[in-house]
């Protein structure tokens, strides 16, 4: 859990993982908030955080401008409200694309919908730069519900399974939905790729040679063993900064693993 050290075309990336407790009937935690920094609770030592929320965890209204926000929620829920009138709840595998363009005010709160059991949340938020000519375009917004998120299953050379969910770009012949029209990802020459990969134990997965200028990052976010990337052992919650002009072989250890891939030309 925490920020990802990534660079252009990405402005920022954050992985939130919170083991939220049972809800209190009002979408907040059924636990004391004593000792937490009210309105600014980011302590990485805790199992969960309130962030800027005071009763419900999350990020109340705040502005964005000049970039695209990609929010991926594999587990838990997010409630979105914005100044353009869009609102809704998404999660459990859904993805939101939002071009902030000339400016938008929005909030994203993390409702604890279950009062009878814990409410774990996993969320990736990625800020992708907009082309200079598109920075002041009208804000735009698209939901990719989990049933519409392009997905494929493949066998590696040993018959082990690789599951690929493609948010932007194309992997193994699985192509994403159309990006937002003013996105950096709208030009295929920018080689923007965002995908979530689930690897069976002892699986091998290969990333192709694309270009010498492309940035490529792999975050190992969930798993009990290590992942080998060109003989380097990646531990859980570690991020690898890889070459874009090399074929990269990723070899999983002896338990299932989940990785996030981010690619793109600066």
Model-assigned labels for residue ranges:
Residues 1-266:
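Jelly-roll (double-stranded beta-helix
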């Amino acid at each position: 859990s925490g920020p990802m050290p990534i660079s252009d075309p990405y402005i920022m990336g954050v992985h939130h993982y919170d083991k939220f407790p049972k809800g209190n009937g009002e979408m907040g935690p059924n636990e004391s908030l004593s000792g937490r920094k009210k309105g600014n609770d980011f302590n990485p030592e805790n199992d969960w955080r309130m962030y800027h929320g005071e009763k419900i965890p999350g990020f109340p209204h705040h502005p964005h401008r000049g970039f695209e926000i990609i929010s991926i929620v594999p587990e838990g829920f997010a409630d979105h409200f914005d100044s353009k009138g869009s609102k809704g709840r998404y999660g459990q595998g859904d993805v939101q694309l939002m071009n902030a363009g000339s400016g938008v005010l929005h909030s994203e709160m993390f409702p604890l919908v279950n009062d009878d059991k814990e409410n774990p949340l996993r969320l990736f938020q990625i800020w992708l730069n907009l082309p200079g000519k598109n920075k002041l375009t009208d804000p735009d917004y698209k939901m990719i519900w989990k049933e519409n998120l392009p997905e494929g299953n493949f066998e590696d050379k040993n018959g082990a399974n690789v599951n690929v969910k493609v948010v932007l770009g194309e992997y193994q012949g699985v192509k994403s939905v159309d990006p937002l029209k003013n996105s950096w990802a709208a030009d295929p020459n920018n080689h923007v790729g965002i995908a979530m990969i689930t690897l069976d134990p002892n699986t091998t997965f290969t990333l192709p040679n694309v270009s010498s200028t492309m940035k490529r990052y792999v975050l190992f976010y969930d798993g009990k063993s290590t992942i080998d990337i060109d003989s380097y052992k990646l531990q859980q919650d570690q991020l690898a900064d890889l070459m874009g002009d090399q074929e990269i072989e990723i070899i999983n250890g002896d338990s299932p693993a989940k990785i996030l891939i981010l690619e793109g030309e600066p």
